[in-house]
Every structure is written in structure tokens, then in C-alpha cells.
Amino acid sequence: MKSSASNAGTPFSYALQGEDNELLLFNYKDFDLRIGGKKKTIGVSANDGKWHAICVTWDNKNGTYQFFKDGAIEKQETDFMKGYTIKAGGTLVLGQDQDNVGGGFAKTQSFRGTMDNVNVWSYVLPKKAIIAFSKSCSFGMGNVYKWSDFKYGVKGKTAVEMPSSCSPINN
């Protein structure tokens, strides 16, 4: 992702009936991760106008989450929503926080910038893969959502570039 915006933008939100923050990555100037409505402040920013490879992993067995920026672990904690299961059947939206399923968008929470190669897996990727992905534009394809799934649901003031505009991060 790349952004120089100063608003509390939302790269990713997944909402269900009854839980609008089932899975949310919010506020790229001081990231928050929300799972099942519970919030963890990451305290890492990515709104400096440069490309950043952002990856978040979470293991529900022990509640361990990891926040990677450009292939490096910036924050890791355990016991966050341990035993919780993210429910299927929701709506995933890139670039907006959903205050109700598929809507309730607030302009102040919209993502302003460029996103590329967004993928979602049902398992925790190995650190080695995350590091490799951060150094190339070949991110593989998520088994829940892959980047190409998003091009058909584009709405609003969104432009799709094909091929994508990914720039490798050189750490």
C-alpha cells in the first residue's frame, strides 16, 4: 500500500450482520487491528507516501497476531481473541470501514492512496513467505480472497490499473 493521507483511513474491513468490525485493519497513521469487535492498537504507521508491504497474521489457537511492515515484524502479541473464530458469510470491503454490512461508510475513514496485491489466507503464512512476498510483486494467491477477486466489485472514485502498479520493497 502507498498513502500520504493524514486521515484515519481503512485499508480492509470484513463485516457480518451484528458485528461490523469482525476483521478490520484501520488507521494507517497508527494502525488498529480489530477482531470480533475487540481492538488492538499496533502503533505503526504507513502513510509516508512510500510503498509498504503490510501483512497481518493471527492464530486463533493461542491468539498470537503479528504485524509485518516491509517484511519485518513490527509488533507481536499473544492472547488476543484466543479461541475466537472469524465467521464466514460476511462482506469484505477494501478502502472503507463498514458501519453496517456493505455500507455505513464515512468519508473520513476512507482509504486514500494505492493498494496492490491484497490477499487473504485461512492460515498463518510462514515468516519466510511473508519476507519473500515483501521483496517482490509476486504475492501468490490467497485461498480465501485473491487480488483478482477485487477488480469486479469496484465502486466510487476507484481506479483499477492492469497490470498492477506494485513496486518491490528493497529492504
Give the ranges of each region predicted by the language model.
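Extracellular glycan-associated modules
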Residues: 1-171
